[in-house]
Regions:
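Short, Lys/Arg- and Gly-enriched loop/turn segments at beta-strand edges
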Residues: 34-45, 79-89, 170-173
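A generic structural signal for residues embedded in beta-strands
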Residues: 29, 71-74, 164
């Protein structure tokens, strides 16, 4: 089964499912980048982004028969990045807020490498978040929590297995 990136949400827990699966199964899930695509040019101002629509998650997918107390195991078999990636900094944000100026860079990606400011480096693609419906009504996909959601860890890459604790029936992965 293939689920395309056009079928995405910005909150876990409240959306109509796009598919139903029975575990164990194998899926191909296309994902959006964290900005859902609008960052396409160097120097693009942050002000052009709608920050209520960042960190989209493809789905949700009902896992039939999964009940509270179960653990879903999601194994990432492959990640195939796009041909470019975007980096964006915002003034006053991050670990060095007084030193950071707003900027946007577009990095070409080819043959397992990306190029940033003329330097080619190995690419280590990762998935920002994989989550399940939370016990509360909903959680924005950009919020880290027990449900998985936005993990932002380089450990969530090809070959990794993510275990998610089910807290609601048919947990909307």
């Amino acid at each position: 089964m293939r689920i395309t990136r056009e079928r995405h949400v910005y909150s876990l827990g409240v959306s109509e499912p796009v598919a139903t699966v029975t575990a164990p199964c194998s899926l191909t899930v296309e994902t959006c980048d964290c900005f859902n695509g609008p960052v396409t040019e160097a120097g693009q101002p942050k002000a052009r982004l709608n920050f209520s629509h960042v960190n989209p998650a493809t789905g949700p997918i009902v896992v039939e028969g999964a009940e509270p107390g179960d653990v879903l195991r999601v194994h990432i078999r492959a990640i195939r990045p796009e041909k470019t990636g975007a980096l964006m900094t915002a003034p006053g944000a991050g670990a060095l807020p007084d030193r950071v100026k707003g900027d946007t860079r577009i990095c070409p990606i080819a043959d397992g490498h990306f190029t940033f400011m003329g330097v080619e480096r190995p690419l280590n693609p990762m998935i920002g978040g994989i989550g399940v419906a939370p016990a509360c009504e909903s959680v924005p996909c950009g919020t880290p929590g027990d449900d998985g959601a936005h993990l932002g860890t380089i450990g969530l890459r090809w070959g990794a297995t993510r275990r998610l604790r089910v807290v609601v029936p048919g947990p909307l992965l």
